[in-house]
Amino acid sequence: MAQKIRFTKMHGCGNDYIYVNTMEQSVPNPQEAAIRWSDRHKGIGSDGLVLIGKSPVPEADFSMRIFNADGSEAMMCGNASRCIGKYLYEKTHPWPLPVKEGNGYQETEIRLLTLSGVKILYLHIVDGVVERVTVDMGEPVLENESQFLGNRVLDKGTFVSMGNPHYVIFTDDVDQVGETGRALERHPAFPQRCNIEFAQIVSGKTTDKTKADHATIRTRVWERGSGITEACGTGACATAVAAALTGKAGRKSDIVMDGGVLSIEWRKADNHVYMTGPAEFVFDGEIEI
């Protein structure tokens, strides 16, 4: 008899994944499953597969593994982490972690173990429903650009790692992502491949003497292993950091992606990047393996 896997499809700003609770069941070959299930014509259709599990270390409450549509394993996904927060809170009864009372809302924290470390999720809850999630994405890692100097292709952008590598190009034509994203992802300068963002400052532009408190940045993404996606949480964070580093914006930005808006703050106090955005259920289902 064929084994059936229960799954939930969710999305964060259109960045959709298949979520499987491995505390209740197992996926024997997640790489192969990600390829087959992500197919939008012959499978469920998604940008990849996310496995939710128990944390093997005491520093975290739960764990996440994420596989791209091509079967490769990703270090981190901001949109998926928000969806996991909503999934866990709304599908776990009783809720095992402390809940704080706010003015008309509740808040709870989840420590989520990823391949790029433990991330803290702050869930904003109204009437038992998670309305939005803020994720402490940690400190950005600024790549050493000396190896790229003199390269006509790679001297126009900014390199930022948010647990996975991003190359951000500011341009007046964000639709270039469809033409050049694939080539840049696999450029020889990126032996592990790279996520590519094309970004345009829409409002809150700065001068040399001042930086806007809050910028709006239109961004399109080519995700490593998945291609063009509706949104990318770590890509939004990388874009906001790159804008601040290059003097195009201050430390707060709204990143407008194809699938929605993410609010990003790069705080001076701890040098951490905080991402806030929605998470939505699409449907539950079962699939044979």
Regions found by a protein language model. Give the residues of each.
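A glycine-rich beta-to-alpha transition motif near the start of alpha/beta enzyme domains, typified by
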Residues: M1-V129, V168-I289
